[in-house]
Regions:
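C-terminal motif of bacterial Sec signal peptides marking the signal peptidase cleavage site
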Residues: 24-28
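Bacterial signal peptide processing site
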Residues: 29-33
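Short, well-ordered beta-strand elements
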Residues: 41-56, 72-78, 199-205
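Short helices/loops that flank or line small-molecule/ion binding pockets
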Residues: 61-69, 81-95, 215-222, 232-250
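Ligand-binding cleft/hinge of the Venus flytrap
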Residues: 63-70, 191-230
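Ligand-binding "clamshell"
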Residues: 106-165, 246, 258-271, 276
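A conserved helix-loop-strand patch within extracytoplasmic ligand-binding domains
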Residues: 132, 136-205, 301-305
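A bilobed periplasmic-binding-protein/Venus flytrap-type ligand-binding module shared by bacterial periplasmic
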Residues: 171-184, 276-290
Length: 341
């Protein structure tokens, strides 16, 4: 009896080892995000990088705090105009970016392929209403992919040395907004009624996408504005131009448009003019373990559109908090960390 247990014990051991390896893979198999890592624990300090605007910085600090709460050393790098490029160049390990921008950048990597290859990546990118970094600088027109299709294409890419983690149920997708007074006065609630009114309306659009978006307005909606006012990056990240009636319609992002205090009306149907921008983390897999993947996915899973709106308001409102403080307070309110900073 005892003699027979040796081989059985060996088989059991091998089976458990195989099961352990499978579990290490499955631990990161969140919906739409499969990540293979060779280790359970992260072995080095991770560097996170985000764009320069306050909301991006607050989001980065929230992920950093989640990693720290899991016992992982992590720090924020200086803000970057092209955070995705910083990760791909090896100067950072993490960024949370819009899904279309990620798809456009990652689809160009050698060996990357999705359901339709690199062409699908290119077709999924279009105008970001506030910035124009190199990840999508070559995307001149909106693609044919909606938000769900973009995420599927993104998570289907085969990446070496990098991984796309779980997308949040929150977007920074572009949209068009107007004041409630303008909406009521012109009976304007969706893009189908925009064309005859455009010659009377001034649009505010960030400089980086002004040419492209103006062309899309004409091509898709037969909209030819009275004037297109070019907004600087700082102006475009807020909604003061439309609130102050400097312009009647402004291109902004969903987390800006939904703040109740601003009493803005989102023009329905405007999504056809902008690339989907679901918040999606990109990580380097070098020295990154399942502990980091789990911590990052935990935050992404909890992040909903209302949460992004609240975080944005905390970081950019009238009594704005510094991004690290906004992130810490938001995480505490959501009970996502065991040791609030």
């Amino acid at each position: 009896m005892n003699r027979s247990t040796g081989p059985l014990r060996t088989l059991r051991t091998l089976g458990l080892l195989g099961l352990g390896a499978a579990l290490l893979f499955l631990a990161a198999c969140t919906p739409g995000a499969e990540v293979t890592t060779s280790q359970a624990a992260t072995t080095r300090e991770l560097v996170l990088v985000q764009g320069p605007d306050a909301t991006s910085q607050a989001l980065g600090h929230a992920y950093r705090d989640m990693l720290a709460d899991a016992g992982i050393k992590a720090r924020m790098a200086d803000p970057a105009a092209d955070p995705i490029g910083e990760v791909l160049a090896g100067r950072a390990d993490f960024t949370a970016a819009g899904s279309s921008r990620l798809l456009a950048a990652l689809g160009k990597l050698p060996g990357a392929h999705g359901a339709h290859g690199a062409d699908a990546a290119a077709s999924g990118a279009s105008a970001d209403p506030t910035t124009d970094t190199s990840a999508t600088a070559d995307a001149e027109t909106p693609g044919d992919l909606d938000a769900a299709q973009t995420k599927r294409e993104l998570h289907a890419l085969a990446l070496k040395g990098f991984a796309v983690l779980e997308s949040a149920d929150a977007e920074r997708t572009g949209t068009l907004v107007l004041t409630a007074a303008t909406s009521a006065g012109d009976q304007l609630v969706d893009t189908s009624g925009l064309a005859p009114l455009c010659p009377q309306l001034e649009f505010g659009i960030a400089g980086g996408i002004k040419t492209e978006l103006t062309a899309q307005l004409a091509a898709k909606l037969d909209c030819h504005p009275k004037a297109v006012i070019e907004l600087g990056d700082a102006q475009a990240r807020g909604v003061l131009p439309v609130i102050s009636d400097e312009v009647q319609i402004q291109a902004t992002t969903l987390e800006n448009s939904g703040i109740p205090d601003n009493a803005l009306v989102v023009l329905q149907g405007a999504e056809q003019l902008f690339a989907p921008a679901s918040i999606t983390p990109l990580i380097s897999t070098d020295g990154v373990g399942q502990d980091a993947v789990k911590a990052i996915n935990k935050l992404s899973s909890a992040l909903k559109q209302e949460d992004l709106l609240n975080l944005n308001r905390m970081a950019t409102g009238r009594d704005a908090l510094e991004p690290p403080k906004a992130a810490a307070d938001w995480l505490t309110d959501k009970a996502l960390v065991t040791d609030p900073r």
